[in-house]
Amino acid sequence: MSNLRRAAEALRRSKTVVFFTGAGISADSGIPTFRDKLTGLWAKHDPQRLETADAFRANPTLVWSWYLWRRHQVSQAKPNSAHLSIPQLADAGWDVSVVTQNIDDLHERAGSSPVVHLHGSLMDVKCFGCHRPAELSPDQLAVPLEGQLIEPPRCTRCNGRLRPGVVWFRENLPDNAWRSAVRLVRACDLLVSVGTSGVVMPAAGIPDMALAVGATVIHVNLEDVGMDGADEIMLEGPAGVVLPALLQATGVAALSPPGVPT
C-alpha cells in the first residue's frame, strides 16, 4: 500500500485532527523570503538582527518600520491550496484545529478555526512595557514609504512603546498558546505535520506528544524527515500538492478557487 493510501486510511479512521504547520505550508503563497526579496532600506539589514528585544530597545523606530513592511507583505499574500484544504476537511465533518509556528494570518483567511499561533502573529500588537494587547487604526499600521521610518505608537495604559505581537529570538512561547496547543494535541487521534523544520523547540516535540497519546502522525514535507515510528506516515512533496491529494484520496473534494496556487 502506498503512503498516500495509508495516510488516507488513517484520515478516514480519525475524528479529531490537528494540523501542525510551519513555513512550508506558506511557501506557495508568495510571501517574500527575507534574503531573496529585500529591497531598498531593508537590503542593508540582517533580519535576524531586527527580530530581538535588544534590537527594539536600541532602535525601536527601525524595528517597528521593518515589521510594518513585513505585515504589508503578508497582507498581499493569498492562502494557497494547502491552507484551503484544512477548512474543507472540517466542512466534511472532521473536528479540525490548527497549531502553527507561522506568524502570518493565512490559516484564518482560508477559513480555519481555531488557530493557535505558537510564535504570535504579525497581525497582533502589544505593549513592550506592560505586555497588554493593543488595537491600532489602519492609518497607524500603514506601511512606511521607501526609506521612511515610523516611531512606534504608545500604549494608552502605561505609555510604553507598542511592539509586534510575535515571539522574538530568545523569548519564551506565550503560555496560553502553548497550553492550548498541548490540550489540542493530547486530544487528537491524528496529527498532520506540514512544512515544519522539526528543530525549533519546544514546538518540535509536538509530533512525539501526539504519538505518546496513541495518535497517528502524517508528515508532509519536501524531504523525508527521518521518522521511525510504526504510527508515522511520510508524504513527500509541496504542501499545496500533497494536502489536496490526501483529501481526494480520502473521498473529500479538494478544489481550489481560480487564482489560488496548487
Swiss-Prot record:
Its main location: cytoplasm. GO terms for molecular function: histone deacetylase activity, NAD-dependent; NAD+ binding; protein-malonyllysine demalonylase activity; protein-succinyllysine desuccinylase activity; zinc ion binding. The active site is at 119 (proton acceptor). Residues 1-262 form the Deacetylase sirtuin-type domain. Substrate binds at residues 67, 70. Transmembrane segments: none annotated. Zn(2+) binds at residues 127, 130, 155, 158. InterPro entries: DHS-like_NAD/FAD-binding_dom, NAD-dep_sirtuin_deacylases, Sirtuin, Sirtuin_cat_small_dom_sf, Sirtuin_class_III, Ssirtuin_cat_dom. It catalyses: N(6)-acetyl-L-lysyl-[protein] + NAD(+) + H2O = 2''-O-acetyl-ADP-D-ribose + nicotinamide + L-lysyl-[protein]; N(6)-succinyl-L-lysyl-[protein] + NAD(+) + H2O = 2''-O-succinyl-ADP-D-ribose + nicotinamide + L-lysyl-[protein]. Its cofactor is Zn(2+). It is an enzyme of class 2 (transferase). Binds 1 zinc ion per subunit. NAD(+) binds at residues 22-42, 101-104, 195-197, 221-223, 239. Coiled coil: none annotated. GO terms for cellular component: cytoplasm. NAD-dependent lysine deacetylase and desuccinylase that specifically removes acetyl and succinyl groups on target proteins. Modulates the activities of several proteins which are inactive in their acylated form. Belongs to the sirtuin family. Class III subfamily. 2 residues (Tyr-67 and Arg-70) present in a large hydrophobic pocket are probably involved in substrate specificity. They are important for desuccinylation activity, but dispensable for deacetylation activity. This is NAD-dependent protein deacylase. The gene is cobB.
